[in-house]
């Protein structure tokens, strides 16, 4: 009986049953973490490229480069939109609030805030689609066009315009704009850890229709429009 109590022949199996699952979790967790970092970097880089392309493309908010001046403002042609001493708006140009728009994709087509027309027509070289396609080429570099299976889709993209306060009255091509390209409601799938741990992660609030998974932060890049 004493000999049986001192028998340690099965101790290796017990140690293995404790160490092996931990080893698998750490190993596969490292792989999942690396893939997550790749996704984060790719999404960030995609917004950089999207902003660069957006500032040299036709605007998605169609009329934003044709500000409406009053008769008295038109008489100030060539005058700056701001006071050179203080840097504040002097009333020579339309208010900055009227020259801003957030353009997103909706189920029935795109829409822009502030009353602007969402433009993604062939006549203007499909500005929204062109920006999206170039961003997909970065985020889903392992896929080929038309990027049907790319996690980055139209619903994730927002193109925003806002007046900078610079420029002068009746400036050709419109007043300078800060163009922001952002990604929202993106999710990341944990391929190994998610299955092993039976994680069920729902998209964050306000992201109806997004694929379930870990909610990535919002990515945004802003550049000033070119002449």
Regions found by a protein language model. Give the residues of each.
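N-terminal hydrophobic or amphipathic segments with adjacent small-residue motifs
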Residues: 4-5, 23, 44
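Flexible, glycine- and charge-enriched loops at secondary-structure boundaries
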Residues: 7, 36, 128
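Perimembrane helix-loop junctions in membrane proteins
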Residues: 36-39, 43, 59, 63
């Amino acid at each position: 009986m004493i000999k049986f109590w001192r028998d340690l022949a099965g101790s290796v199996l017990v140690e293995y049953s404790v160490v092996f699952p931990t080893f698998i979790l750490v190993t596969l967790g490292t792989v999942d973490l690396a893939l997550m970092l790749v996704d984060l970097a790719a999404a960030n880089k995609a917004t950089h490229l999207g902003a660069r392309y957006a500032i040299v493309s036709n605007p998605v908010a169609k009329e934003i480069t044709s500000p409406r001046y009053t008769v008295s403002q038109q008489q100030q042609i060539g005058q700056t939109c701001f006071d050179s001493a203080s840097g504040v708006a002097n009333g020579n140009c339309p208010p900055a609030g009227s020259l801003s728009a957030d353009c997103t994709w909706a189920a029935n087509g795109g829409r822009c805030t502030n009353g602007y027309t969402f433009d993604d027509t062939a006549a203007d070289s499909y500005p929204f689609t062109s920006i999206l396609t170039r961003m997909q080429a970065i985020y889903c570099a392992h896929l080929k066009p038309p990027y049907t299976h790319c996690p980055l889709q139209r619903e994730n993209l927002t193109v925003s315009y806002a007046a900078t306060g610079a420029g002068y009255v009746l400036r050709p091509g419109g007043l300078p704009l800060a163009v922001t390209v952002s990604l929202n409601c993106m999710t990341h799938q944990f391929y190994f850890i998610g299955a092993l741990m039976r994680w069920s992660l729902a998209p964050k609030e306000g992201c109806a229709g997004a694929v379930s998974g870990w909610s990535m932060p919002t990515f945004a890049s802003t550049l000033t429009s070119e002449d």
